[in-house]
Structure formats: structure tokens, C-alpha cells
């Protein structure tokens, strides 16, 4: 099998316009090859027209520094970044071009505060006995009427308005305490919000993030609910998830009026929509495509390392980029995925990149394709290294080391 060269890959894309899926076994040098494709792209298309996306910011910074050192300079601040950052760049450029407020990410603390506000509303409903539709879903989901106790931290005291809280307030009447609501000047609303379990809020935030990463938008809700109508338990779970998401979005809009705030997990969904809307009418006339790409800050070449860890929303974003005219080189191995718990489906994504909208051409990466001499360790090498480092065998062996053969 002939070695795969970066220039050959780019020549093929320039010739037929199809994306390339580069698959390599573990240790075959996939990241090094992806980096070499980026370097070739920067030299061929220009310093701002090639970008590499990796799975994390730390890896992006390390690889980006290598690119800058090798080139001696960089027109881009971050030639290696994340797929979410590419989406954020497109969203920012789109909104700037139309005079809309620039996007700002919500951090974890801000998301938690909004979710606590959402749940505090239903805690107040439960205390007042004025349950809403979401309260009813919470009751069914937790399978008990007193579901409030399940989402509150132990030791936070009684909720304002509850019978025990009212009795405590009556017992304090006539005392010197100046606070009619709670100690330390906290209002009852504060106590509702702060008393909610951190673990519950964390799980709720993760659930909403998974919905975004799976690409489950508002328009998909009816179809998904119809698909689970025969499973009562699953139907309640989905209905509750969608109801809480709607309330979370409403709380976000109320908390940040006039701003465009979004979760990091929603970046790829919003990015795909922005690119789709910008190029939706370009099927017949491609003359304005380069200008639209430049207006959105899209590079001519995007190299994606560890593509097997991309979420479904990420794959849709890549498909929209491919439709917009971005040259794509996807590098990965489905057997090395480490993000399946966050909405990655490696085998499906690799197959979809070839059989789906991208119609990517698959090519195999042979170890050493980057030009570096890559040695293949034998079992003797492994044993020798373990002995030299005094690493004990993982197998139980009653004989002392001196008597072992």
C-alpha cells in the first residue's frame, strides 16, 4: 500500500471537490498527518484559509504553537482550534454583518443559576398547591407527590411557605429578629433557589447539553414524542425534558434581554443553521459563494482530527460547511472514540460521512505516512522496557523474581 501524502490529498480535493475521510489504526500517526495537511493547506491556500479542528483547547494550543514555530509566523491567532470555535466565528460574522448583537457564551455558573430559577418556580408551585403542567410531569417522573424533597439538599431547612416553615416563623414572632423571611437577609426566593440539589442541577444541565449535541431541536420534538407514545415512562421523560428546556430558554431570554447568549453545547447547532441560511439559495449560482464564505469567516480548508468524537450536531455542521464549499479532510478511527457518553456515535458518523451528504472518499493511512520513521515494538521490546522501569507483571506470580524463568 502506497504512503498517503498531504499534497496528494489536497490535489484530489481540488480536482473533484469531495471531502476526504482518512482512517488510520492506533499509532499510525493520524494527528501528525492531519497537522501536515494543515501545513500544506496554509502554504497552498494562504495563511487565513486553512484551519485544523481538534477535540480540546489544550491540544489545540499545543498544536497551534507547533504550526507557528514551523512557519515562523501566523496570520491567524489560532490556526488550530475546536469545531465549536469555528462555529462561533461563523455566528459572530453573520450577526455582525446584519447589525445584530454579538454572541456571548454562557458559562457553567450562569447556566446553573438559570436552571435553579426554572426549578424554583415549580418549588413555589408545589408549596402553594398551584401545580402547573410541568409540575405534574415532575410528579409523575419521580413517582411521588412529594417530589420536592428529592431535588433539595439535605440540611437546607424547610422551604418558605411550607407548614414547618410557617410554624417556625410563628415561634419567632415577638423576638428581636429583624428578618421576616430568613436568616442573613435572604429572601424566600433565594432560599427556594439555593436549596436545590447541586447534583440535580448538574444532571439537568448535562441532559440539556446532550439534547443539543444530538441535534435535537424544537422542530424535532413532535416527531420524537410520537415515536415513544407506547412507552409511558419514556414519554414522560421526553415531555419533561422538552418542557424544562423551553422554560430554560425563556429564562435565558428574560435574564439577558437584548443579548444573544448561548450554551457551548448549542454552538454547533446554531453554526449549522447560520451556514445553511447563508448558502440555501446558492444551488444554481455559485458565483457569490467565495464572498459568502469570506463574509462568514469560513476557511477554504478545514482539517478535523479525531472526527470519530464529533457529535451528531457536529456532523451536521460539517455537512453544511461542505455544502458551502469548504474543503474537508476528516481524520480518525471509530475504535478510538472517547466521547460516546457525550453524544458521539463513531461507527455511524464514519459511515454517514461516506454515505451521507458529504459523500467523502475514504482513504487508509499507513503507519509512517507522515515521513517520520515509526518503529514497531515487538513483545521483546515491551518486556525489556517493563524490566528496565521495574514495572511488575499484572499477573499474580508466587515465585520471587529471581526464580522466575
Where are these regions (language model features)?
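Conserved P-loop NTPase-based nucleic-acid remodeling module centered on helicase motor cores
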Residues: 47-206
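Motif I (Walker A/P-loop) of helicase-class P-loop NTPases
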Residues: 31-39, 315
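Catalytic acidic motif of RecA-like/P-loop NTPases
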Residues: 58, 307-311, 335-336
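Conserved RecA-like helicase ATPase core segment
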Residues: 315-405
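Accessory N-terminal region flanking or inserted into the helicase ATPase core
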Residues: 1-26, 33, 141-303, 384-388, ...
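Alpha-helical scaffold elements adjacent to nucleotide-binding pockets in ATP/GTP-utilizing enzyme cores
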Residues: 37, 62-67, 86-90, 114-118, ...
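SF2 helicase catalytic motif II
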Residues: 300-311, 329
Amino acid at each position: 500500500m502506497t504512503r498517503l501524502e498531504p499534497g496528494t490529498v489536497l490535489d484530489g480535493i481540488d480536482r473533484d471537490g469531495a471531502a476526504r475521510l482518512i482512517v488510520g489504526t492506533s499509532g499510525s500517526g493520524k494527528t501528525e498527518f492531519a497537522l501536515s495537511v494543515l501545513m500544506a493547506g496554509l502554504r497552498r491556500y494562504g495563511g487565513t484559509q486553512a484551519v485544523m479542528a481538534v477535540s480540546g483547547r489544550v491540544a489545540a494550543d499545543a498544536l497551534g504553537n507547533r504550526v507557528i514555530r514551523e512557519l515562523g509566523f501566523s496570520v491567524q491567532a489560532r490556526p488550530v482550534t475546536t469545531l465549536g470555535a469555528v462555529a462561533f466565528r461563523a455566528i459572530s460574522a453573520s450577526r455582525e454583518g446584519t447589525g445584530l448583537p454579538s454572541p456571548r457564551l454562557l458559562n457553567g455558573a450562569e447556566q446553573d443559576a438559570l436552571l435553579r430559577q426554572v426549578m424554583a418556580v415549580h418549588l413555589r408551585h408545589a408549596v402553594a398547591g398551584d401545580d402547573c403542567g410541568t409540575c405534574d410531569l415532575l410528579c409523575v417522573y419521580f413517582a411521588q407527590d412529594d417530589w420536592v424533597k428529592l431535588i433539595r439538599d439535605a440540611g437546607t431547612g424547610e422551604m418558605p411557605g411550607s407548614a414547618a416553615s410557617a410554624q417556625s416563623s410563628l415561634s419567632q414572632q415577638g423576638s428581636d429578629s429583624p428578618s421576616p423571611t430568613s436568616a442573613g437577609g435572604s429572601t424566600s426566593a433565594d432560599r427556594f433557589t439555593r436549596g436545590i440539589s447541586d447534583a440535580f442541577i448538574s444532571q439537568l444541565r448535562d441532559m440539556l447539553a446532550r439534547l443539543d449535541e444530538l441535534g435535537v431541536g424544537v422542530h424535532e420534538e413532535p416527531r420524537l414524542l410520537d415515536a415513544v407514545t407506547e412507552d409511558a415512562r419514556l414519554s414522560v421523560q421526553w415531555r419533561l425534558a422538552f418542557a424544562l428546556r423551553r422554560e430554560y430558554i425563556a429564562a435565558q431570554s428574560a435574564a439577558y434581554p437584548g443579548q444573544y447568549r448561548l450554551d457551548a453545547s448549542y454552538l454547533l447547532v446554531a453554526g449549522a443553521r447560520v451556514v445553511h441560511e447563508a448558502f440555501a439559495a446558492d444551488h444554481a449560482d455559485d458565483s457569490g459563494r467565495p464572498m459568502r464564505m469570506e463574509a462568514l469567516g469560513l476557511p477554504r480548508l478545514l482539517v478535523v482530527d479525531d472526527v470519530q468524537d464529533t457529535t451528531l450536531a457536529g456532523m451536521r455542521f460539517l455537512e453544511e460547511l461542505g455544502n458551502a464549499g469548504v474543503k474537508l479532510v476528516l481524520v480518525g478511527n471509530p475504535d478510538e472514540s472517547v466521547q460516546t457518553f457525550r453524544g458521539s456515535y463513531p461507527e455511524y458518523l464514519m459511515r454517514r460521512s461516506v454515505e451521507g451528504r458529504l459523500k467523502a472518499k475514504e482513504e487508509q493511512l499507513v503507519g509512517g505516512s507522515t515521513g517520520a520513521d515509526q518503529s514497531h515494538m515487538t513483545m521483546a521490546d515491551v518486556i525489556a522496557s517493563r524490566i528496565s522501569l521495574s514495572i511488575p507483571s499484572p499477573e499474580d506470580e508466587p515465585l520471587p523474581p529471581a526464580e522466575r524463568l
